[in-house]
A protein has these predicted regions:
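Divalent metal-cofactor coordination and adjacent catalytic microenvironments
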Residues: 1-306
């Protein structure tokens, strides 16, 4: 007999770091710590690998602060399930675990877990808002006096078992290939959370620029046509994101805080210019942690923190 598996456990899987190594190195926030001595005696490659590991951990910490143990700010295609009652209009209003909701792909409902009826989701029967979506009946079940039913499920005040798939979060990916100046398209590692007409930022230091996805994009290809040719050339692995810059700023603060807390060779640059050893008791990391939490406060999602 097959077990009953919570689909959410296998769909919260798109975790891409929110900053790159170069973004940390070039940030004035990180200028207070010595990034060249994270691994005592290590070469440049070892130091870069150490920064990357700190970025992974800081990105996960930012997710935990905002969404609890399982969620991520990165755009993800999530399948969740729950029990819902129809409202007085006969509509099912669903508050998924995470927001912003970008699209709803599927919905099924039934009085028993094994007897759910799939509903074909479209803009005519599914109203998507930032933090909730409403599913009405199929168009064929509407009458002059309102909706009749969801397929085989008549409206009732009893809770119904629902399973739904939706996309939420902020597009966050990297360039899968280098892009030359004047290019009219970019190739990304993932197109999840990206839509035609959407503005994205290519975060590349002094060559950072914004692009807008052209209406000619087919919605699935990882090669994204853009409305205006690139101003700068960009190397592969550069971050491409719809995330607000405050999230990046917060993650860099968390990286700096981790370095100050380590006490394993990390150096803190004093205001007078003389480096001093950062011990495990270094209290200056608290200001970076506090600043990170302040920057992430707007992204707190209570529903996903049960």
């Amino acid at each position: 007999m097959s077990p009953s598996v919570n689909p959410a456990n296998i769909t919260y899987d798109n975790r891409v770091p929110y900053v790159t190594v170069n973004e940390v190195k070039n940030s004035p926030i990180a200028s207070s710590v010595d990034l060249s001595n994270l691994i005592p005696g290590g070469d440049a490659g070892a130091q870069t690998a150490a920064i990357q590991q700190l970025i992974y951990m800081a990105s996960a910490q930012a997710d935990n602060i905002c969404l609890g143990a399982t969620g991520t700010l990165c755009a993800t295609i999530n399948t969740e399930q729950g029990r819902y009652r129809a409202n007085r209009q006969g509509f099912i209003v669903v508050h998924p675990a995470y927001w912003p909701i970008l699209e709803v792909d599927s919905f099924a409902i039934g009085s028993l877990p094994g007897g759910q009826t799939p509903i074909t989701v479209s803009s005519s029967n599914c109203w998507v808002e930032s933090r909730q979506f409403t599913v009405t009946a199929n168009a064929s079940t509407l009458t002059t006096v309102g909706p009749l039913d969801f397929g085989s499920m008549g409206y009732t005040n009893q809770a119904q078992f629902c399973t739904y798939t939706y996309v939420n979060g902020f597009a966050n990916t990297t360039l899968a290939a280098s892009a030359s100046a004047s290019a009219t398209s970019i190739q990304v590692a993932s197109a999840t959370g990206i839509y035609a007409g959407q503005p994205l930022t290519i975060w590349d230091g002094s060559s950072t620029e914004s692009v807008m996805i052209a209406s000619s994009w087919n919605g699935t290809s990882t090669t994204l046509p853009i409305n205006t040719a690139l101003t700068y050339a960009h190397a592969s692995a550069v971050n491409v994101s719809a995330l607000p810059a405050t999230v990046k700023q917060a993650v860099i603060h968390l990286v700096v805080a981790a370095i100050k807390q380590r006490g394993e060779g990390g150096l803190v640059i004093a205001e007078v210019g003389a480096p001093t050893a950062a011990t495990s008791n270094d209290v200056t990391s608290s200001s970076d942690l506090a600043r990170a939490r302040d920057l992430l406060h707007a992204f707190l999602q209570v529903w996903g923190r049960t």
